[in-house]
Every structure is written in structure tokens, then in C-alpha cells.
């Protein structure tokens, strides 16, 4: 039954996200193309057009973030706590399956939004460099890439990969926290939306406070990240690979534990405190 729920969820949201991604890629092509011709054009009107396209591209990027977050909230609240909830909760499925389907689909679409944004940046970069002779620049670019790879030891790549895992788990945990906040806000008859928003920020504050209490939030962990980004060869001197991986693993554990807690809280409230009246 979970498979059917996921199929329904992806069908219900595909048009929204698909249109948004097409708009994002179209904006990147238009903006990048305008920058490509800008160097050979001395028209004030064309410069104004480039400025407007830059604003459009920025607005679409911001809109992608906003729409992704709002869709996560709306699909959960309207589908499970609103009028559609009367139908959804009569299906032969458990509350765990309902929340799981929402969490999986939201996670997939969030990853797709990140990939779409990265692709738009790539398209923009290629179009901005289109006036260069890329074939002549390729050997130099390849040499630079090989040199950068040669400077990075195995500890760097392990740390980089683990950072990606930590970021992914934190994202899933944040989505689960959004669902838990929606359920908490649902308990308030007056101003449930405001209560849900306040609940989310309180929950995130508590999670961040506990991370800082264990000295793995904005302290050791971010120091290690900045050290890697600043100089990939200095990770051994700035912070040992073992120490970095240890702090990252604790960070991962905290994020995973909170994610499980938010998920469990959501399911429990939906099972015992749901009121669709």
C-alpha cells in the first residue's frame, strides 16, 4: 500500500515541481544567453534587459526554494489534516505509512530541487564562457582539475562524502520536524498555522542547542568544514581526520536521532490526537 501512496503523491506533485524546474532552466538559459552577447553589445537597452533577466533568474531561484518548502507543508497539512484527510484516513493504511509516503516524496523532490538549481548554475556558467574557445581551454582546465585531485588525500574525500551524508540526514530530519510542527499546530484550534510555525522554530532551537551543548554544531564541525574548503591540504594540521570524522559521526547521530523522534512524534499525534472537525 505504501507503493500506491507514493505513486499518488508523486503524481499529485509532479506538475508543480516539473513546471518550476522548467522555469528555472529556462531562466538560466535566457540569463546566460544574454550575458554571452552582453560583451559584444554596447546598448543601454540591452544592459537593462540583462539586469531584468538577472532579477528574474534570482526570483526563480528564490521561488524554487519557497515553493519546495510550501509544497512540503501544504501536501502534508491539506492532504492529512484538512478536508482531504477524511478520505486519506479511511484508507486501509497505517499512520506510519501515510507519514512515510509524505517524507519520502518530499525528500526526493527536495533533492531534485537541489539538482535543478545546480544544473541551472552549470548552464549559466557554460553560457557565460561561450565566447571563449573552450576547446583550447580544455587542456588547461583538465590540468587544473588533476592538480586539485592530486592535492586531496583519501581523508579529504572521506570527509567530503561524509559531509554529504550528514547534510542529507539533516535535510530529512528537518522535513520530519516540519511534519511534527504541523501536528503540534493542529492541536491549537485558534491560529494553528502560527502555532505550527512557532513550534518548528522552537524544535529547531532545541535541536541546535543540544548540538552546541555537545560541541558538534557550529563549533568543531564547521571549523573542520571551513578548514577543508579553505585549504584541502591543511586538514591534517587544522583538525585531525579522526577528530573530524568523530565529530561528524556524532552530528550525524544527533540529526538521525532527532529525525526519528520527530517522525515518531508525528505518527503518535496523528494516531492519538487527530481532530478533523
Residue ranges and their predicted role:
Residues 90-94:
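Short helix-to-coil transition segments within interhelical loops
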Residues 1-85, 95-277:
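Hydrophobic alpha-helical transmembrane segments of membrane proteins
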Amino acid at each position: 500500500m505504501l507503493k500506491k501512496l507514493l505513486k499518488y503523491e508523486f503524481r499529485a506533485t509532479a506538475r508543480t515541481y516539473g513546471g518550476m524546474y522548467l522555469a528555472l532552466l529556462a531562466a538560466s538559459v535566457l540569463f546566460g544567453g544574454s550575458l554571452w552577447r552582453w560583451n559584444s553589445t554596447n546598448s543601454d537597452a540591452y544592459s537593462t534587459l540583462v539586469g531584468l533577466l538577472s532579477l528574474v533568474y534570482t526570483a526563480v531561484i528564490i521561488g524554487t526554494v519557497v515553493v519546495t518548502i510550501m509544497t512540503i507543508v501544504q501536501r502534508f497539512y491539506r492532504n492529512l489534516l484538512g478536508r482531504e484527510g477524511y478520505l486519506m484516513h479511511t484508507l486501509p493504511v497505517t499512520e506510519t505509512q501515510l507519514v512515510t509516503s509524505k517524507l519520502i516524496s518530499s525528500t526526493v523532490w527536495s533533492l531534485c530541487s537541489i539538482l535543478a538549481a545546480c544544473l541551472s548554475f552549470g548552464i549559466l556558467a557554460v553560457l557565460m564562457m561561450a565566447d571563449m574557445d573552450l576547446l583550447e581551454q580544455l587542456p588547461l582546465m583538465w590540468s587544473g582539475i588533476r592538480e586539485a585531485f592530486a592535492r586531496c588525500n583519501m581523508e579529504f574525500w572521506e570527509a567530503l562524502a561524509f559531509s554529504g551524508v550528514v547534510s542529507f540526514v539533516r535535510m530529512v530530519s528537518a522535513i520530519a520536524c516540519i511534519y511534527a510542527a504541523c501536528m503540534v499546530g493542529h492541536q491549537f484550534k485558534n491560529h494553528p498555522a502560527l502555532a505550527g510555525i512557532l513550534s518548528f522554530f522552537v524544535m529547531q532551537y532545541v535541536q541546535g542547542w543540544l548540538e552546541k551543548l555537545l560541541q558538534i554544531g557550529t563549533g568543531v564541525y564547521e571549523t573542520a568544514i571551513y578548514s577543508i574548503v579553505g585549504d584541502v591540504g591543511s586538514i591534517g594540521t587544522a583538525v585531525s581526520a579522526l577528530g573530524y570524522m568523530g565529530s561528524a559521526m556524532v552530528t550525524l547521530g544527533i540529526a538521525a536521532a532527532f529525525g526519528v523522534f520527530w517522525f515518531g512524534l508525528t505518527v503518535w499525534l496523528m494516531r492519538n490526537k487527530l481532530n478533523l472537525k
